[in-house]
Amino acid sequence: MPKSSKKPLSILLVSDFFYPRIGGVEVHIFQLATSLIRLGCRVSVLAHHHKDRQGVRIMGNGIKVYFNQLISLHDDTSYPILYGCHKVLREIVIKDKIDIVHFHQGTSVTSLECVLHSRTLGLRLVYTDHSLFGFGDLAEVNINKVLRSVFSDVDQTISVSNIARDNLILRAMFNPYKTNVIPNGVDFTKFKPDKELQKKKNSKDITIISVSRQAYRKGTDLLIEVIPEVCKLFPNVKFVIGGDGPKKPLLENMIETSNLQDRVKLTGALHHNKVRDIMIKGNLYLNTSLTESFCIAIVEAASTGLYIVTTDVGGVGEVLPDNMVKLVNADKDSIIKGIKETIENYDNIKDNTNDFNEVLKDAYNWDKVAHKTIKVYHKAMMNLDRSIITRIKKVLAIGKISGIFHVCLIILDYLLLLFLTLYQPVKSFKKEKQFKYENYQKYLRNMK
């Protein structure tokens, strides 16, 4: 594996969302960290604690994880107390000699707080945006205001699609020249077709797979409308629905009222390692999302040999070649029409699905994603103007009231840093041995 010619960096990935929780952001951080380690970087993760996951853990692939124990809100996100993670962050930065703080997801409280503290500690900041947000309701307006304030401290941003990039620039009023587009990756060793099952597939018995969180944004309401209609049109069609969420009771009610217990199977929440086992049994993959910045699920499904029918929302249209996907409008009639046309033409489509994995493997390779991300890190390191005066000027440009409020937060943060420096000076920290990935790989080979 070729390594970067530049000095290896020490990276801290920050988010409320990380294993053992399962989701798009969690998988992204894990896979990115794994690939960065393979390329010679040192990687640590700061995440919110989850049940019994507390303190410091070293994962099998060499990722050092700090589970920060703070008060929890809904869905295991941290309660916002602004300065709650400053002390922990400073200790991590000193012990692991962090160069770059890379935070994920604008709705992560831990991420947003760490931006404030990281800049005070003199670190470079990179942000990856995983979601699209609108400008309509109060919650979206508020998060956009917060992002605009926070982004005055950010050196570079990464978006997973061009649509997501444009959305981020508009929401946060961020400098377009400091934004980068790097698509998500897929672990193609886990998502590959079953050749024997592929040979047996035909239009006589169609299984439609859909795996997502059962929530409004993921289009569960549309799915509930579409399933009974498709089952009426095609007696040979069955559905397998994976995932959990607040809309799951509505799905269960639809199955019962439409008497589809024999034709619609709900698997419930799935561990990421089990998703492929569900997908390989299907013919088509249906995505009914109302908003998506990328949609990694359709890449995973296509790589296992499924043809995709998906709503054309957000960055979905950028993800797959035309011969792998049918894009439809986000309404019941369009989705039903798309499924109908695909089923009627399935015997012709099926032959092409065997090559999907090889085509996608080159486009969405995690090592490529990591290489591109390292280039963004080096761009961030080139930002030399780190003075407090420049920082305050940027913050004041946000607006009178919000700017002054943010300046007060910054001043308090510097005072807290001064106190911590006196209370716990740098020389009081013990030197820690760095994890060496090469030695670990050698150990595993010897074990075999």
Model-assigned labels for residue ranges:
Residues H49, I163, G185:
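Carbohydrate-associated surface elements
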Residues E252-L270:
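Nucleotide-activated donor-binding/catalytic signature segment of Leloir-type glycosyltransferases, i.e.
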Residues L12, K200-P228, V240:
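Conserved donor-binding/catalytic core segment of Leloir-type glycosyltransferases
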Residues Y307-T310:
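Short hydrophobic beta-strand element within catalytic cores of glycosyltransferases
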Residues M1-R53, K64, D367, M382-K448:
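N-terminal subdomain of nucleotide-sugar transferases
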Residues A269-L270, D277-G282:
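Short alpha-helical donor nucleotide-sugar binding micro-motif in glycosyltransferases
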Residues L290:
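Aromatic "clamp/platform" in nucleotide-sugar-dependent glycosyltransferases that forms part
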Residues D322-D333, T342-D347:
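Conserved acidic donor-binding segment of nucleotide-sugar-dependent glycosyltransferases
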